[in-house]
Amino acid sequence: MYNKNKLSLSASFNYRDGGEYHDYRDYNSFPNEFWITRQAFKREYKRLNSVLGLQYAATANWTFGFQYIANTNNAKANRITKSSVYQYENSNPFNEILSEVNASQKPKFNSLNLFNEIKLDSLGKKINVNLDYFNYVNFDTRPYEGTSVRKIPFNIQYFNGINNNQQSTNNFSGKVDIELPTTWANWSTGGKISVSKTENYITAFNSGLVTTLNPDLPQINNQYHYDENVQALYVSGNKKINDQFEAQIGLRMEAIQTKSHSGNRNQSIDNKYTKLFPSINLSYSANKNSTYRFSYSKRIARPNFAELNPNLTYVTPFLSVEGNQVLRPYFVDNFEFFYTYKKLETKLYHSLENDVFNQVGLPYLETSNIRLIYKNIFDIRRYGISQTFTFDKLNWWNSINTLNINYSTAKTTDLMATVANGFTSFFTTNNDFNLNKPQTLLFNFSFDYYMFGNYGIDKIKPFTSTSLALQYLLLGKDLKITLKATDVFKTDRFRFTSIVNGVHRSSDYYFDTRMFQLAINYKFGSKKVNVKKRQTGNEDERARTGN
């Protein structure tokens, strides 16, 4: 960081060279066959992230500048899949399918933000203007090959294929935020325009089960385009009525137009809608120990750009993965009531999630194929209560503990599946300890326990996660040495069951959340140097690319 007179500069560079391992186990009960599929997924990556920022105070009331972000990633992945197929009257598999996929991905992300901050008076009235552009490109290639061995009668078949996808996403956005504090209330208003264009150029070949492989891999070309335009306006106000009562209200309107086009199918799908998103927050302090608060909000959850890509990739001839060009965003209404008494907070809540999308495995009874696809598949209603207790009576120990219990019901849409209605409960505790008087030796212990749960069509089994951290502060606390461990006992496994198209599925997934990290951080230079961190105007769109 550099800060002198009217000019402020900031720069950061981060490089990460690492890897991860995922373990997937699926058990599918077809009417005449039982499938056990295990996938071992390994990925190695080299990531570089750089941020450069500048801001200049042209006058006492006008500051402008820019922020540039560049991310690059070079990832190579290997996925080995083994499926064993059983007849119910026999304990030995009659068919074994072995597949290997080697993937290479080279995503690049570049983003430029131009900002202006104009102060209108000394009371805090100001205008913020953000102009943003980003470009995201990714070349993804996935060749695969394998064998299918049937034991009775003995027969060996082969398969191979490749899938290449060149994706490019461009986004332009402009955002204006106006803050208007007055003696009566604090108001804010603004608007945003966002234009996104995504293009996918796909080449693919899938041999299916054959006796002789084709080494040439003759590929079929396809193109997929997705355009999204969003116009939004909002207004909100905050009013402190007296020492006990405070109110905040807001309203956002969004108009959205999307168009997706598949070249091979010569099919275009247009979607247009306008939605209102109200919010309200009311707070009442009965006395110094008791506070009541009610809030309501409506929000939208959009699919990321990869989930909208209908690109079809094969893991084996019987297992495929694809996105969905007609995937729609879903909407969530949240109602919450809080009561806080000293260090104890009670929350009652109710949520409605409409037209939720998720990845679902669609089994086909005739072929025993499973198609993993993103779909809008259910509505969820949830009612719950949570208790949070904070313990801080000892100067060397601070503890925050939460117990949450809720009941949910689901209704499927365009899917023949058994819904998972029932209770969900989890407990979390986070504890900070000062191990010496100067408070330079710190320790943290956190523990999460997911007892049982239901979500849509999935019944979720229990899991736990334990994390530890030790930090030592030196040289006037400018030097920080941190040793951190997450999921110490490797118990953070996602296990669930579901029934789709009459096929029972039981899954056990581990996403390599166990990690040990040693970090050394040293701050040098003047402690007075400080460059204001700013948010860009396209945070939501950036997140949908994974950046």
Regions found by a protein language model. Name each.
Residues 16-28, 34-37, 44-53, 57, ...:
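Surface-exposed extracellular loop regions of Gram-negative outer-membrane beta-barrel proteins
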Residues 38, 171-175, 216-222, 334, ...:
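Outer membrane beta-barrel strand-and-loop segments of large Gram-negative receptors
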Residues 222-228, 271, 300-354, 370-384, ...:
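Outer-membrane beta-barrel signature, preferentially recognizing the C-terminal barrel domain
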Residues 421-547:
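Conserved C-terminal beta-signal and adjacent last beta-strands/turns
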Residues 17-49, 55-57, 61-127, 133-168, ...:
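Flexible loop and strand-edge segments within Gram-negative outer membrane beta-barrel domains
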Residues 4, 15-19, 70-76, 118-120, ...:
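Transmembrane beta-strands of outer-membrane beta-barrel pores
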Residues 188-290:
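Signature of Gram-negative outer-membrane beta-barrel scaffolds
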